[in-house]
Amino acid sequence: MKKPAFIITIDTEGDNLWQNHRVIKTENARYLARFQALCERFGFKPVWLTNYEMAIEPVFIEFAKDVIARGQGEVGMHLHAWNSPPEHDLTGDDWRWQPYLIEFSDEIMREKVLFMTHLLEETFQTKMLSHRAGRWAFDRRYANLLIELGYQVDCSVTPRVNWRNAKGAPQGHGGTNYQHFPDHAYFIDTEDISRPGKSPLLEVPMSIQYKH
């Protein structure tokens, strides 16, 4: 009997990101090597899903380049729409409301995904293959953008969790409802991301501890 795969993924982002600060600091970048060393000790190769502020942080860049060079981990893409270029003020105060990327127009969504992908690939000189959506907000448009750009794995789905009541833009409809999504890995259907299909994008849902 094969043992189940165990994958470690880390949202690699600024300090206290949810405190609505107007300036995001990245002091935590100085301490990531400790966790990397722990992973290596037990033979794990973590995936550092990297947000904009960390992608331009020199300490993290040096750290991640070393991890990649030694083949001991991977850098992937993670995107929070309110502080990832190009800037587009959706709500009048995006730093306060932290809108979901899927609340933006197709054009703005595309520009932001392209920018982050190119920034990461140019900085780390490696193809971006893995992705997790900021605030777990994922939809069909987003999935098709990832496929177009050659991503192979997404890990945005939180099975049985409904994020509709977690507001982004005040006039929006909240996050993604994953209540009826699979709890196992599957290649997504490009027309309905809650169903298995024939696309090249593998969805690896998160492990969730449910509240009873």
Predicted regions and their residues:
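Active-site beta->alpha N-cap acidic-glycine motif
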Residues: 1-70
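Short loop/turn motifs at secondary-structure junctions
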Residues: 3, 43-44, 125-127, 150
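Hydrophobic faces of well-ordered beta-strands that scaffold small-molecule active sites
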Residues: 6-10, 46-48, 75-79, 129-131, ...
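A structural signal for the main folded, soluble domain(s) of proteins
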Residues: 26-27, 34, 38-40, 69-74, ...
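Alpha-helical packing segments of well-folded alpha/beta enzyme cores
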Residues: 31-35, 112-116, 120, 142
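Metal-dependent polysaccharide deacetylase catalytic core of the NodB/CE4 family, i.e.
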Residues: 52-137, 199, 208-210
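Active-site-adjacent pocket scaffolds in enzyme catalytic domains
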Residues: 133-212
